Amino acid sequence: MEKILTVQELNEALKTLIENKQEFKDIYVQGELSNLTFNKSGHIYFSIKEQDAAINCMMWKTNAYKIQSLNLEDGMQIICYGRLTYYIPTGRVSFEVRDIQIHGIGDLQKIFEQRYKELEQKGWFDPNLKKSIPEFVKNVGIITADSGAAIYDLIRTVHRRLPLINIYLFPAQVQGDKAEIDITNKIKQANNFKIDLDVLIVGRGGGSYEDLWAFNELEVLQAIKNSHIPIISAVGHEPDWVLSDYVADIRAATPTAAGELVSKSIIEIKNQLKHYYQNYKTLILNKLDFFNEKINNYKKDQTKYIKDNFSFKYLQLKQLSIDNTKWTKNKIDSVIYKLEDYKHSINNSIIHIINSQNKALKNYLIADEQKILNYLKKQISEFNYTISSFKGHINQILKYEELSFDTLENKLNSLDPLKPLQNGYSIVTNLNHQKIRSYKQVKLNEDLKVILTDSKLTVTIKEVKTNEQ
């Protein structure tokens, strides 16, 4: 009698046969992607099919990171690499996928990797070649398609954050045949534009690997490298990397992110201006303190010098007077002993000589002291005049800077769309955030939002009256 197998035995035998067979361990299968599902556990489930056949596939989360940049969608032709597995409880054969390639992209990936190595060796990615974006941007050039969500999101982001920025659009074909030529020409056109652009955003929204390929072409990369305007590469989504991201001066994850990079909010600018003003004011005050201290030290040094010099001269004069007196007295005594008869005559002569010498020395001392005092007074007068002029100049600068800052602050405040709310006005919008300017935009019993200076209200239209009623 033939052996009868249980279902368990049959399935175990099939599992051993399928999973141990070498031909099913490392295989490549091409087909159309279908039923793509990203499970919250991190695993990915899908099918690959053709006209009359299909097989269920899974990719565990440990390998899921490999396909983040592929932007997979149902209907794509893909090539899966992995092995066959057999699940005993349901008797199902599945394809456990370890890696996925989009059909036809394999050759493009090889070109990408080879081109990356060549450009890296040539120094095209050197950080020292990167140009910096001005701190305050006024004129922005954008090279992208003139339709689609990317351009509208980018413009909306820039104008929301800083309405003063001027935007100049250079519409370009961003995918398909000859797209790289159009992008290259638009970069050159922007560099020769009649208005000096502060920064240039080159990019597009998301797409497949082939859709983004124009930004890997050498013509585009050479134009980016040669641009005298700083360039931000903003291609696709966060996981997407193209060669223009490496050659450009800055890479933005998305076009919207590029808009945030080039536009500072009004609040940021006001805070930065206040910071600059305080730093400048502190610097000037420190300079004034330094010069005042220097002046005081100079005055002290000059006073000490005069006092010391005067004391020295006085001691010199006193010693000279003492020496002369002793010499004269000895001379007189000698003459008295020898010439007693001429005592009165010689005594008068000596007194005359002493008076003459004392007078001469006194005149010398007075003249020398007066000369020093006059010189010092002149120096101090000139120094005080210089300091007075310097203080006046500094005060003028501070007044000018304060006036300029107040003027700029008033301009910024006038641009604040919420400023009128402080005067009792309000902003009315529907639930889709569209501003209500006329009764024609509303219906009875429709809910509206009213924005006040300190709160938001939700109201319902109960009655409509025009101003004429």
Curated annotation (Swiss-Prot):
Q: What is its EC number?
A: 3.1.11.6
- GO-annotated biological processes: DNA catabolic process
| GO MF annotations in UniProt | exodeoxyribonuclease VII activity; nucleic acid binding
Keyword DNA-binding assigned: no
Question: Can you tell which superkingdom this protein's organism belongs to?
Answer: Bacteria
| Keywords assigned | Cytoplasm, Exonuclease, Hydrolase, Nuclease
Reactions the enzyme catalyzes: Exonucleolytic cleavage in either 5'- to 3'- or 3'- to 5'-direction to yield nucleoside 5'-phosphates
One Pfam assignment: Exonuc_VII_L
* Gene Ontology CC: cytoplasm; exodeoxyribonuclease VII complex
Please tell me whether the keyword Cytoplasm is annotated for this protein: yes
Write out the transmembrane intervals.
none
Mind telling me which NCBIfam families this protein's record contains?
Answer: xseA
Query: What does the similarity note say?
Result: Belongs to the XseA family.
Instruction: Please explain the role this protein plays, according to its UniProt record.
Output: Bidirectionally degrades single-stranded DNA into large acid-insoluble oligonucleotides, which are then degraded further into small acid-soluble oligonucleotides.
This protein's assembly is summarised as:
Heterooligomer composed of large and small subunits.
Name this protein carries in UniProt: Exodeoxyribonuclease 7 large subunit
Which gene name belongs to this protein? xseA
